[in-house]
C-alpha cells in the first residue's frame, strides 16, 4: 500500500511512519506549518523523513491558522497544565485542524497516486478533539470518496484510532522508533515541560507500556499527581 504519512514530528506520527515503512510502501511524510507555537516539532518530522529515506514536504497554512484564533497552540494563550481529560485542555483545540490538513493530504495523495493517507489519531484524543474520533474518520472517508470519485481511490489509514498512547509506544518500540527523536510538548521550550497535557500523556504512556522513556522533562514527576487526580475522579 503506497502511503503518505501526515507527520507532525510527535511520538504518535513518527511511530506511525516507522510502522508504515516496515509494513507498507512509505512514499513520504507530509507536515503542516499552521503557526503552532511548538513549530520545532517540524524539525523532528524532517529528521524522521531523512532517517527513513523518504521525501518530506511542509505545507505552509499559516495564513489559515492565523484565522483559527483562540487556541493555546496558536495564540498568546497560556498552555494549561494537567491531564488531557480536564476541561481546561479544550483551549488546545484548533477548530477543524485535522479536516483542513486531511483534505490537503488527500489532494496530494491523489496527485502522487498514493493508495492511502495515514494519520496517527488515537483513542486518547477522543475526549478533547472531535476530529480525532472514529465518527469523524468514517465521515471524512465518505466525503473523500465523493470528492475524488472517478479520479483516485485513497483510503484514510488510522491504525491507532481505537488504541491508547501506551499501545502506540509499544508499537513504536516494536518498529524501532527512536523516541528521543520525537517532540510532543505544546510549549515548545528547550526541553519537554513535563506539565502540559501532551507531556503528561507521553510520560504516562511510557509508564503503562513498560518502555523506558528517554525524554528529558523540566518537571519529570508532575505526571504522577496529574494522572492520579484523573484516576481518582474516574472512581467517583
UniProtKB/Swiss-Prot annotation:
GO terms for biological process: queuosine biosynthetic process. It is an enzyme of class 6 (ligase). Catalyzes the ATP-dependent conversion of 7-carboxy-7-deazaguanine (CDG) to 7-cyano-7-deazaguanine (preQ(0)). This is 7-cyano-7-deazaguanine synthase. Its EC number is 6.3.4.20. It comes from Sinorhizobium fredii (strain NBRC 101917 / NGR234). ATP binds at residues 7-17. Zn(2+) binds at residues 185, 193, 196, 199. Its cofactor is Zn(2+). It catalyses: 7-carboxy-7-deazaguanine + NH4(+) + ATP = 7-cyano-7-deazaguanine + ADP + phosphate + H2O + H(+). CDD domains: QueC-like. Keywords: ATP-binding, Ligase, Metal-binding, Nucleotide-binding, Plasmid, Queuosine biosynthesis, Zinc. GO terms for molecular function: ATP binding; ligase activity, forming carbon-nitrogen bonds; zinc ion binding. Pathway: Purine metabolism; 7-cyano-7-deazaguanine biosynthesis. Binds 1 zinc ion per subunit. InterPro entries: QueC, Rossmann-like_a/b/a_fold. Belongs to the QueC family. It comes from the Bacteria.
Amino acid at each position: 500500500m503506497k502511503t503518505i504519512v501526515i507527520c507532525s514530528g510527535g511520538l504518535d506520527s513518527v511511530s506511525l511512519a516507522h510502522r508504515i515503512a516496515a509494513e507498507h510502501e512509505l512514499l513520504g511524510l507530509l507536515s503542516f506549518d499552521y503557526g503552532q507555537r511548538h513549530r520545532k516539532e517540524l524539525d523532528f518530522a524532517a529528521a524522521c523523513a531523512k532517517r527513513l529515506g523518504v521525501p518530506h514536504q511542509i505545507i505552509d497554512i499559516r495564513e489559515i491558522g492565523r484565522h483559527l484564533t483562540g487556541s493555546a497552540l496558536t495564540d498568546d494563550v497560556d498552555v494549561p497544565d494537567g491531564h488531557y481529560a480536564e476541561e481546561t485542555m479544550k483551549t488546545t483545540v484548533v477548530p477543524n485542524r485535522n479536516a483542513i490538513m486531511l483534505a490537503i493530504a488527500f489532494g496530494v495523495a491523489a496527485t502522487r497516486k498514493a493508495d492511502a493517507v495515514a494519520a496517527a489519531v488515537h483513542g486518547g484524543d477522543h475526549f478533547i478533539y472531535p476530529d480525532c474520533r472514529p465518527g469523524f474518520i468514517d465521515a471524512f472517508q465518505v466525503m473523500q470518496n465523493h470528492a475524488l470519485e472517478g479520479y483516485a481511490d485513497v483510503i484514510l489509514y488510522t491504525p491507532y484510532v481505537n488504541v491508547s498512547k501506551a499501545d502506540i509506544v509499544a508499537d513504536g518500540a516494536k518498529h524501532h522508533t527512536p523516541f528521543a527523536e520525537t517532540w510532543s510538548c505544546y510549549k515548545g521550550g528547550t526541553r519537554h515541560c513535563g506539565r502540559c497535557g501532551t507531556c503528561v500523556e507521553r510520560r504516562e504512556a511510557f509508564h503503562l507500556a513498560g518502555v523506558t522513556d528517554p525524554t528529558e522533562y523540566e518537571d519529570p514527576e508532575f505526571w504522577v499527581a496529574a494522572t492520579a487526580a484523573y484516576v481518582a475522579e474516574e472512581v467517583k
